[in-house]
Amino acid sequence: MRNSIFWWIFLGFMLSLDFYVFQALRVLTNSAGARAKLIIHVIYWTISALAITMLIILPYLHFTQQNRVVRNTFFAIIVGLFFSKVIASIFFLVDDLRRVIQWAAGKLFFSNTEGETMEQGVKISRSVFLSWAGMIVGGGLFSSLVYGLSNKYRYRTHRVQLAFDNLPAGLKGLKIVQVSDIHSGSFTDKAAVMRGVDKILKEKADLILFTGDLVNDVAHEMDGYMDVFDKLKAPMGVYSIFGNHDYGDYHSWPDRNDEHKRKEELAGKHLLTPMQQANLDKLKDVHAKLGWRLLLDEYVELEKNGDKMALLGVQNWSSKARFPKYGDLKKAYEGSQDYPFKILMSHDPSHWDAQVKPTYPDIDLMLAGHTHGMQFGVEIPGFRWSPVQYVYKEWAGLYEDGKQKLYVNRGYGFIGYPGRVGILPEITVIELT
């Protein structure tokens, strides 16, 4: 990361933000005494310097259990300060644009004296107001992100009843628990994670389905949590799929070199490196040791009360260009045509619009995750919003189109920002009727 051009660009942008926000701080402290002004400025630059230092150190903190807390703390502070300053800067930018337009108008349409008089009459009140507004909104965002750190293990159970006209009588009342996006590499509190597993077990579900992203990057992230998640059991079994993070695409593999990139160019597609493939094989073993049946572009037959259904599971497949397409729904679907009811597990919800609806109208229910609801948003009765909705049309909860349904789980774990604001971690309980 530290060698990537993105990291240097981000570091430069952080420094630019620090100086830009400081200009607004100078406006607000202009009337303060010299001592008070000095103290405020020193505090500001101390915090900014610490954030920059954390950003520089972060890439050197290799993944270990001991480093998880430090990495999460550093990342939370960096992200919190960054977005708070970005939001605050929008207000400051409005003020700067206003002053530029006002100055230009004064030069073009008024005499110098008239322009200066107009500027003097409004610049202090408007500049101070917008500076205060920016600081308050930015501070409010930072406060909400700090509060959100306490929500990362506040598991919320969402209960949905789904009615299907073609559901066989023997499957009516089937109880499914869906879990998604565990991201075990982010956890720092094993007891809290276990409390979530206990909530799942208390549901006494017939079937438990996990829709991908067991780890952030590498299989050994699960080393300390095998004895937590191997407790997930259900009469009809526990089934799982891979998500985009499970392939290790975001990890710096030593053998992702020029030679490997040439192989990708010749193949015309993304290829796993040998080390990456070995890691994926280890992760397959993790699923097996947990007692989970990992579905890799295939289906299994499930039966209850004499009636049968098909459960399909595909590897990660996204309509978004930044995510490689590993899954093969055609392969998974082959042979399941005659089953009266079908459930598909596919990690990325964009799969629903891109392939499932137009090509497989007899897939009754798709279960997905991936979005996390961006771990930030607002959910109140009658209103739901998150920035992720501008990227994903289906990003949380239930969606219906004709006889087909999609449910997007908000995620059990977290990645990046180690918290949740408004969008809490989810355990989904589905009853088929």
Question: Where are the predicted features?
Answer:
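Non-catalytic terminal accessory segments
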Residues: M1-Y153
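Acidic, His/Gly-rich catalytic cores of divalent-metal-dependent hydrolytic chemistry
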Residues: D18-V21, S31, L55-I57, L61-R68, ...
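Membrane-embedded segments
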Residues: Y153-H158, G170-E259
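Extended active-site neighborhood of metal-dependent phosphoesterases/phosphodiesterases
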Residues: V160-A163, M226-V314
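Beta-strand-turn-beta hairpins that frame and shape the catalytic cleft
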Residues: A163-V177, W292-R293, Y299-L311, Q337, ...
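Acidic/histidine-rich helix-loop elements
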Residues: I176-A191, V215-D217, G248-L272, S318-P324, ...
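Active-site neighborhood of phospho(di)ester-bond hydrolases with catalytic His/Asp-centered motifs
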Residues: V177-S180, I208-G212, G237-N244, L295-D297, ...
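Conserved beta-sheet core of the metallophosphoesterase superfamily
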Residues: P349-T428
